[in-house]
Amino acid sequence: MKIAILGAAGRMGHILVDLAAKKGMDVVAKVDIAPGYDTTWGADTEGVVDFSYHTAVPANIEKAAAEGIPYVIGTTGLAPEEQSRVDACAARIPVVQSGNYSLGVNLMLELVNKAAKALGRGYDIEVVEMHHRHKKDAPSGTALMLAKSAAAGR
């Protein structure tokens, strides 16, 4: 499969580029605003994996939707207007979106939901996180997912 990786200069971008190569995928574009990276992807792209920055997601997914290219989003911190543009594109192309793709986190989401259900409304639930001071999205996508999972369990 020919994929474009957006946010290729970032932590996850580097991991994804390496993993794609190990899995025999053809990374046809390594897109990032950092010098030395592609600025967009070409017509031969069959899928886009986006770990860029929230403000870049809407224009990128709209380009993919116009070209009929499936889209995976790992970028977090989207504003409501940005998310609504993603949702509109998801009606036209396959879109997979998560704030965290880790198996452990997704199991934890399920456990938090069940714990909230078991504890009931007599207990307060609080999500507390700690991260480096340069984190771009705070609260993190994972913290928001945990809070939503707890709320849904009520």
Where are these predicted regions, by residue range?
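N-terminal glycine-/serine-/threonine-rich beta1-alpha1-beta2 phosphate-ribose binding loop
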Residues: 1-67
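Short, well-ordered secondary-structure micro-motifs
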Residues: 40, 84, 108, 137-141
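Alpha-helical scaffold segments in soluble metabolic enzymes
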Residues: 15, 19, 47, 59, ...
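Rossmann-fold NAD(P)-binding glycine/threonine-rich loop
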Residues: 61-62, 66-67, 75-96, 106-115
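Short glycine-rich or small-residue beta-strand-to-loop segments that form or flank ligand, phosphate
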Residues: 2, 72, 94-102, 127-133
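Short, acidic/turn-prone active-site loops that include or flank metal/cofactor-
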Residues: 33-36, 76-79, 100-101
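Short, well-ordered coil/turn residues at beta-beta hairpins
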Residues: 51, 74-75
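Active-site-lining helix/loop region of Rossmann-like oxidoreductase modules
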Residues: 1-19, 28, 116-154
